Amino acid sequence: MSFSLRFYTPPDFTQPFLADAPDVCFQPTPFDGVAPEQYHAMSIFPEYFKVNGTWLLAEESRMDCVAVYENGKIIVREFRLLKKGDLIAIGRTEDGSQGIYVHANGFSEERELQEVFAFRQGRSRETAFSKDYNELYEILRHDRDHGKIVWVLGPAFTFDKDARDAFSKMIAGGYVHALMAGNALATHDLEGAYLNTALGQNIYTQKNQPNGHYNHLDTINRVRFHGSIPAFLEKEHIDNGIIYNCEKYHVPYVLAGSIRDDGPLPPVFGNVYEAQNAMRDQIRSATTVICMATMLHTIATGNMTPSYRVMADGTVRQIYFYCVDISEFAVNKLADRGSLSARGIVTNVQDFICTTAKALGL
């Protein structure tokens, strides 16, 4: 199939309701981390703010954050990062009447007439996904060279040899530009490389190994002994796996900790807000985001990913967002964000990544 990005059509600012709209009002924050009353909360869509008669687009957006006017630009900032005196956009309307316009239909898309009552409107095990797979393959081929592909992984990948190998090939093939996960993904991947097990089970035969329940703890302990993951890989002569290939091909990875973690591994963020900052740093330039088998990290990533990206040349393009999970709830939770770019695929993620790697010729 022939793939092309959806064309973005900006608002027509000559329309009377936009041309005659007032400038947006800004008010300073009274204290660090506190927005003024009637602050405007951002959505996932392109949003424009009228300043001195000119409509400015918020270039790096994030839902449920506020718009700050700074150095002639609209900067989207989390509440916790606000500083006293920051100028915050005020207004709860989105139709331009307060100098704020949310442009929800900027990307061209063929829309068919939909009936009020129809079967299978959500995504389930009965949904046909062939078209979704083919579109995803084309997106990955495009963004390998013309975008940034960010993957968000749960530990399920590390429990299967073929899935682990397939994702390693994806990294080597240039289809992974950043990886976000938790302590478990990295721990069990390194366990697989070090001891050929995940949670004490052989990653191919799935047979429990003697005292295998120690294996992930031994792996963490050994990494901590060496002081870092790169040192562990070198000293223990590790030559396979997801984390190994991230290091080999200089793919950045963010490991966000949780309250149930063992260890953790040295690079894991123990502070949730530092982890969130590091994740958003990767999302700021992402053009395709694929989340698999981790509801917590998927929802967190979805909340910080807008539906669009402003590229270096000033063009606005769509961000493609996929949620792949065997749980229908997890998939439909992301679809409920209301984004035309959020797509769900209900399947076993181990099979999914193997199928995807083969389709890409890896």
Show the residue positions of the predicted features.
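Long terminal accessory regions outside catalytic cores
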Residues: M1-K83
